[in-house]
């Protein structure tokens, strides 16, 4: 498996990608995944580079603390963030165990998330990043919250991410909490 930056070269491979979520599939297939204004997309390819196993898309942002003064909301910056806009594994490979480490099973979803977190650590050397943020689907919540220590946004936190699928969970992780930081 290889995880590489998504380019037009791989666009024909998106036809077979299906993670079970229309919005997440459509982002990859529509061409938005190639739009740098929408973030940078990375794909997990088969060894033969002829199949997309999974992908993620990241962009930068900021996490603010909301303070209510009278009738006004004031936004106090808490720190820069890398937003995981999308992260998905093809439905044929979901729940595929790759390894076991200290009694903990490691799945493809954990593997691609770890690659994303390593990329965040690399970016942190050049730009201010305090958080990794994401909007999780109900199906993905277990991967992030329970298996990889992402926390639910507090009521007084905001990152201004607007998603057309508002049924998800807003989660964050301090970059300092990424193993290997």
Predicted regions and their residues:
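Non-catalytic substrate-recognition and accessory regions of acyl/acetyltransferase enzymes
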Residues: 1-103, 111, 115-137, 142-181
